[in-house]
């Protein structure tokens, strides 16, 4: 997972506005159990337009993060965004 994390970090520097890059970075941090960094990257992805929330909720790479209190706060933010679009 460490090699993937290095690639994702590099991509985040090269493409700072790409939501998918930050989403993938969140996944890498989750898999390496760096949960604060994972939550931060996931928030950046959402702020930059990531909206595939169904995938986010099922993605095995984010499972470690979903087991933390940090994710509960993100899920609340997602619910608010979903309510705005209904």
Give the location of each predicted region:
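Start-of-helix register in tetratricopeptide repeats
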Residues: 20, 54-55
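Conserved structural position within tetratricopeptide repeats
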Residues: 6, 10-13, 47
């Amino acid at each position: 997972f460490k090699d993937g994390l290095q690639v994702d970090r590099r991509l985040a520097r090269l493409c700072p506005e790409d939501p998918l890059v930050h989403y993938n970075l969140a996944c890498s941090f989750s898999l390496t159990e760096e949960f604060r960094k994972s939550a931060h990257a996931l928030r950046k992805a959402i702020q930059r337009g990531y909206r595939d929330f169904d995938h986010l909720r099922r993605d095995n790479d984010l499972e470690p993060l979903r087991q933390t209190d940090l994710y509960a706060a993100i899920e609340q933010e997602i619910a608010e965004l979903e309510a705005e679009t209904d």
